[in-house]
Amino acid sequence: MKRIVTLILAAGLILGATSAAQAVDFKVSGLWQHRVSFADRNFEKHNGDDKLRAASRLRTQIDVIASESLKGVMFFEIGHQNWGKAAEGAALGTDGKEIKVRYSYVDWIIPQTDAKVRMGLQPYVQPTFTGIGSPILDADGAGITISNQFTENVSASLFWLRAENDNDPEMTKHDAHDAMDFIGVTVPMTFDGVKVTPWGMGGIIGHDS
């Protein structure tokens, strides 16, 4: 796994270097909300809930497009910031540390192929019958996804997700067996009136997984 990841990283750096002289397009999109509400959310007396609430939030996505074969995406989140709450940077004086990075990935196509690679912080969603969200895996994480369209009806994606590693907040433990990785594959198939997606996923916990 280490060797494969190293080769992919090297290929990504080479591809980025060859595209450095080209023009880059920036596309920015997002959502900026401020809201004020007054409501009795708890009918018990002396419940301590505030009836008047105000909050702000910001969602911003920046697409950096070098070519049809190379693109980077950053997605920032600020808030919810409930007005007056110091822990969320919305009390008197503001200056809170509320900027969060949701996505930070690079999309690129392997030269001379149709295979697409996504590397970095990205969404991971396993197929589900309802289409609402998978109860198995529906979250953002860090890893690599490789996808390819083999025929008009069949495609496939292979992913590696580094879920956990070195998460002792005090850094007092030196457990070499604290890495958690997930490896999975999905094979979407579409035919006349039928769409199915066989998939599988496995997890590994241990030293560098």
Question: What positions do the PLM features span?
Answer:
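Beta-barrel outer-membrane channel/assembly domains of diderm bacteria
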Residues: 2-122, 144-158, 187-194, 198, ...
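Outer-membrane beta-barrel and related beta-rich outer-membrane complex signature
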Residues: 42-44, 86-88, 131, 168-170, ...
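Internal metal/ion-chelating core segments
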Residues: 155-209
